[in-house]
């Protein structure tokens, strides 16, 4: 399992890579990236099975892939960049407000810090895609609900009635809380 620190570090590396791509570092003239062309088939879920789609993100994938000379790197970008939207978000409207629960790893729980890190790469696209903007508002709304439930917890369940396996920890565990280990970077 990947640590949160490594996840955030890798997200930063991906963001730097995106900026490098846009600055022509990976221009097609770069002979170091000229490999034999292979068929790289998308590993993304079929469109009907994706949790969320964004027209702006999809357009960016097409645009950026064209700028990446190495077909394998282009394929990796196409599969990795939209992964949070494709597989980990649960977006709905609750009481007239957007609500977005983001699974942050292999555990069905939402960490405040990690859910922020997962949607961070999509922030530049919210002006182009109102639906994506609603998804981001939903994350903020969900995080607010979580903090109001317990400002000292760091990971929460979608269902605020669910009881954690850590319910007997020597802390004030409540239903809806997966883990109560306050982290300063959750703020």
Predicted regions and their residues:
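N-terminal secretory signal peptides and thylakoid transit peptides that target proteins
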Residues: 1-15
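Residue-level signal for alpha-helical transmembrane segments in multi-pass membrane proteins
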Residues: 15, 19-22, 123
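C-terminal segment of N-terminal export signals and the immediately downstream linker at the start
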Residues: 22-61
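Basic/polar, acidic-poor N-terminal "presequence/leader" segments
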Residues: 33-48, 97-113
């Amino acid at each position: 399992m990947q640590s949160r620190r490594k996840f955030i570090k890798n997200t930063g590396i991906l963001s730097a890579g995106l900026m490098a791509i846009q600055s022509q570092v990976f221009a097609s003239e770069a002979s170091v990236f000229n490999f034999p062309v292979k068929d790289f088939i998308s590993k993304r879920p079929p469109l009907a099975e994706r949790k969320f789609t964004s027209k702006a993100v999809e357009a960016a994938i097409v645009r950026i892939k064209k700028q990446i000379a190495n077909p394998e790197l282009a394929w990796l970008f196409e599969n990795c960049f939209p992964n949070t939207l494709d597989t980990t978000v649960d977006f709905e409207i609750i009481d007239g407000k957007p609500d977005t629960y983001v699974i942050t790893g292999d555990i069905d729980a939402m960490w405040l810090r990690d859910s922020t890190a997962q949607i961070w790469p999509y922030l530049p696209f919210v002006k182009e895609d109102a639906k994506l903007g609603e998804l981001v508002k939903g994350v903020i709304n969900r995080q607010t609900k979580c903090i109001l439930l317990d400002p000292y917890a760091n990971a929460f369940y979608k269902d605020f009635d669910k009881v954690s396996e850590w319910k007997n920890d020597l802390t004030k565990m409540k239903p809806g809380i997966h883990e109560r280990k306050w982290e300063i970077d959750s703020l």
